[in-house]
From Swiss-Prot:
Pfam families: Ribosomal_L30 (PF00327). This is Large ribosomal subunit protein uL30. GO terms for cellular component: cytosolic large ribosomal subunit. GO terms for molecular function: structural constituent of ribosome. CDD domains: Ribosomal_L30 (cd01658). InterPro entries: Ribo_uL30_ferredoxin-like_sf, Ribosomal_uL30_bac-type, Ribosomal_uL30_ferredoxin-like. GO terms for biological process: translation. Part of the 50S ribosomal subunit. Keywords: Ribonucleoprotein, Ribosomal protein. The keyword Ribosomal protein applies.
Length: 63
């Protein structure tokens, strides 16, 4: 069986200044803290849920 999990590249494109506290915590949980910083994460349901809450601050690319 091929159980390969796809990855996604997430880049922060807007600042967290002036955003709700929970949105800031989500960015930290994703490993983002500066504009134009990118991380590559597994495309799991928990990551998808976090990305959905702050998608207006991010650029998402499938890998």
């Amino acid at each position: 069986m091929n159980n390969k999990i796809n990855n996604i590249k997430i880049t922060q494109v807007q600042s967290a200044i002036g955003r709700k506290y929970d949105q800031r915590l989500i960015l930290v949980g994703l490993g983002l803290n500066k504009i134009n910083k990118s991380v590559i994460l597994a495309n799991t349901n928990s990551i998808k849920g976090m990305v959905e809450k702050v998608k207006h601050l991010l650029k998402i690319e499938n890998m």
